[in-house]
C-alpha cells in the first residue's frame, strides 16, 4: 500500500518524458520542414524581385533611347558647323524704350555648298524662362543665297515697348537658313539678358501737356492783373487843380505895406506913361497953334 503512491508518482514523471522523447524528433522535423518551406518562399520572392529588377533595367535603355529620339525630333534646329555669324549693334548695346534699336548680322559660308538665308527674327523673353515670350518682333524675310567662301550682311531694327523701360529681359536673335539638301539650321546670334533703358531725352505727351497747362495758367494770371489795374484806374476820382484868380482886382493887398504898394503903383505908372506922352504933346501942339 505504501509503494502504490510512489509508483503512481513515478508513472506521472516518466510518462510525460517518454511522450516528449517520442514527439521531439517529429516536432523538430515539422519545424525544419516549415523553415525550409519558408526559406523556399523567401528565395522565390527574392528571385522574382531580381527578375523584375532585371526587366526594369532592360526597359530603361529603351526608354532613354525613345526620350532621346523624341528630343531630337522635337528640338529646335542648331547652327551648321560650316557657317559662322557675327552681330554688331549700331548704337551700342543700349536699348532705350520706345526708340529704334538697329543691329547688323554678318553671315560667313565656310563650307563647299550654298546656303540660303531665309529669315532673321528677334524677341524679348522672360529672364528666368526663355520659353516664355514677352514681346515677339516681326521676322524679316531675306531669301538670300550665300555661295561658299562668301559673306553677307543683314540689317534688322526693332522698337522696345515703352512700358518695358527699366526692366531686364532676355533678348534672343535667331538667323534661319538651310542648305541645298533642305537641311534647316538656326543660329542664335544673340542670346543674353539686357536691360531696357527708360528714355529721358525728348518730350513725351505728358510733358507737353504740362507745359501747355502752365503757359495757359500764366496767361490767365497776366490778363487778370491787367484787368485789376484797369479797374483801379477807372475808380480813381479826378483831382481838381486850383488855377488862382485871373483878374488883379480880386487880389487882397491889405497885408502889403503901404510904401511897397506905392512903389508898385508908381512902377506901373512909369510903364504906362510913355504911351500917354504922344497924346500930351499933340494936345500941346494944338494949343500952341491956336494961340
UniProtKB/Swiss-Prot annotation:
<feature type="compositionally biased region" description="Basic residues">
    <location>
        <begin position="274"/>
        <end position="284"/>
    </location>
</feature>
<keyword id="KW-0732">Signal</keyword>
<dbReference type="InterPro" id="IPR005595">
    <property type="entry name" value="TRAP_alpha"/>
</dbReference>
<keyword id="KW-0325">Glycoprotein</keyword>
<feature type="modified residue" description="Phosphoserine">
    <location>
        <position position="273"/>
    </location>
</feature>
<comment type="subunit">
    <text>Heterotetramer of TRAP-alpha, TRAP-beta, TRAP-delta and TRAP-gamma. Interacts with palmitoylated calnexin (CALX), the interaction is required for efficient folding of glycosylated proteins.</text>
</comment>
<dbReference type="GO" id="GO:0005789">
    <property type="term" value="C:endoplasmic reticulum membrane"/>
</dbReference>
<feature type="region of interest" description="Disordered">
    <location>
        <begin position="263"/>
        <end position="291"/>
    </location>
</feature>
<feature type="modified residue" description="Phosphoserine">
    <location>
        <position position="247"/>
    </location>
</feature>
<feature type="topological domain" description="Lumenal">
    <location>
        <begin position="21"/>
        <end position="207"/>
    </location>
</feature>
<feature type="transmembrane region" description="Helical">
    <location>
        <begin position="208"/>
        <end position="228"/>
    </location>
</feature>
<feature type="compositionally biased region" description="Acidic residues">
    <location>
        <begin position="35"/>
        <end position="75"/>
    </location>
</feature>
<feature type="region of interest" description="Disordered">
    <location>
        <begin position="34"/>
        <end position="83"/>
    </location>
</feature>
<keyword id="KW-0812">Transmembrane</keyword>
<keyword id="KW-0256">Endoplasmic reticulum</keyword>
<protein>
    <recommendedName>
        <fullName>Translocon-associated protein subunit alpha</fullName>
    </recommendedName>
</protein>
<feature type="signal peptide">
    <location>
        <begin position="1"/>
        <end position="20"/>
    </location>
</feature>
<feature type="topological domain" description="Cytoplasmic">
    <location>
        <begin position="229"/>
        <end position="291"/>
    </location>
</feature>
<comment type="function">
    <text>TRAP proteins are part of a complex whose function is to bind calcium to the ER membrane and thereby regulate the retention of ER resident proteins. May be involved in the recycling of the translocation apparatus after completion of the translocation process or may function as a membrane-bound chaperone facilitating folding of translocated proteins.</text>
</comment>
<feature type="glycosylation site" description="N-linked (GlcNAc...) asparagine">
    <location>
        <position position="136"/>
    </location>
</feature>
<dbReference type="Pfam" id="PF03896">
    <property type="entry name" value="TRAP_alpha"/>
</dbReference>
<comment type="similarity">
    <text>Belongs to the TRAP-alpha family.</text>
</comment>
<keyword id="KW-0472">Membrane</keyword>
<feature type="glycosylation site" description="N-linked (GlcNAc...) asparagine">
    <location>
        <position position="191"/>
    </location>
</feature>
<feature type="modified residue" description="Phosphothreonine">
    <location>
        <position position="260"/>
    </location>
</feature>
<keyword id="KW-1133">Transmembrane helix</keyword>
<keyword id="KW-0106">Calcium</keyword>
<keyword id="KW-0597">Phosphoprotein</keyword>
